[in-house]
Amino acid sequence: MWIGVDVLQAGELDRLLRRDWFRAYVYAPEELAVAAGFGEDRAREFLTGRFAGKEAALKVIGTGFGSGVTPRQIAILRSGGGAPVVRLSGRAERIAADAGMAGIHLSITHKKGMVVAAAMGVPRYVGQSFA
């Protein structure tokens, strides 16, 4: 089954999020543009959630960063209603496609200092097994 979960403490990335190189390496321009519209605390929460989402998506495709997949190849965008939408590119997209995935669904939640992201691969064909 194509399922991935990641959990972070809300402040776990604080030091890294203050570094421009980290933001540029990890986040797509669209993710940073959304975060720029928030105050400092909400931007930090938003970007931490996006990082957890990327980690959960990596687990879905069965690889990790450093295997030719970079964090920016997994962009967590927003639907018209604000829900997270996963956009894969590069090697991440090829791995998912080769596994038979049409895409990845993602949910991110923030509660009491924790961030949790749960992701699920969506099969390309109706009736296709998740195995």
Language model regions located:
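Core catalytic alpha/beta fold that binds nucleotide/phospho-ligands
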Residues: 1-131
